[in-house]
Amino acid sequence: INRPEVRNAFRPKTTSELYDAFYDASEDSSIGVVLLTGEGPSPKDGGHAFCSGGDQKARGHQGYVGEDGRHRLNILEVQRLIRFMPKAVIAVVNGWAVGGGHSLHVVCDLTLASEEHAIFKQTDADVTSFDGGYGSAYLAKMVGQKKAREIFFLGRNYSAKEAEEMGMVNAVIPHAELEDTAYEWAQEILGKSPTSIRMLKFAMNLTDDGMVGQQIFAGEATRLAYMTEEAKEGRNAFLEKRKPNFGDDQWIS
């Protein structure tokens, strides 16, 4: 996210660009892991930010106003794409993660945080906003109901260490080593089975994502089934207008 002068706050143009980048990464078979971070430090004051949420200067009557004058909440589309893409997404929190920016890190698969600069804060109740989906409900699964309500109701600042102790950060890293560590984690994941990573991500999502999660997991299972000789026989028999012969396939107990 490249708006360091406003703590990497997002407006509709930002979220559209984020969506396009994530979509391209999702579709590109040469990509297995995505790192999400914020540009910095700020040219104004040297401050670091991952993302400070929606740019309140772009906020209109029904959402955030784009260059075309339309009101949008398209950051939710970005959240869903991160959640549903078949690849690991790592939030590299190099500074403030606030409001909608906090929700972005929550929806990512893993979070690495700068020891010196990462600060976690939910400001929804300060600006009359509320992330009623992954940003709050999924957060409660991570840190527990009471702690999640504290985070949202009080809007306090939490250090990287405090966030790690709550369970919403995987590791706290010295700032100078944060980017290199993120690449190391990505390389470790890239050394694993792509099919396993995909299926494990969707399996872990399944219990929280209802019928949508079930559909995604089932779709991936169907993809695996298509690769079997049994499936090829079914397809070929249909195309050749004959009865399929599954004689060599066994009913596995």
Where are these regions (language model features)?
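C-terminal long alpha-helix characteristic of the crotonase
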Residues: P4, D45, A113-A118, F130, ...
